[in-house]
Amino acid sequence: MIRIVSDGKEFRFKSLPITMGRDEDNDLPLEDVKLSRHHCRLCRTAEGIVLEDLNSSNGTYVNGVRAPRHVLAAGDTVLIGVTTLSVEWDPEAAPPPRKR
């Protein structure tokens, strides 16, 4: 289960990927004029839960740093346009850590 919180609103998703942006065809459409129509996506990889920018005009930021691609960690803050998001997930939703 993936939980995204923005401006006090909570959105829950059972599976990935999740696309976000201004366009209504996104999994999470957001009303923010600074967002691209298809701004970013959350997906699952062997690394964990990954946030990927989809070549947006204004970029995707994690913890204040522009991040075209970022493996999310608990407590990370995501900024897209002027929208701040927190992303939480059930540890079982992410793949196990890689063995070295």
Regions found by a protein language model. Name each.
Residues 1-2, 83-100:
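Regulatory inter-domain linker segments that are low-complexity and enriched
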Residues 3, 7-84:
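Forkhead-associated
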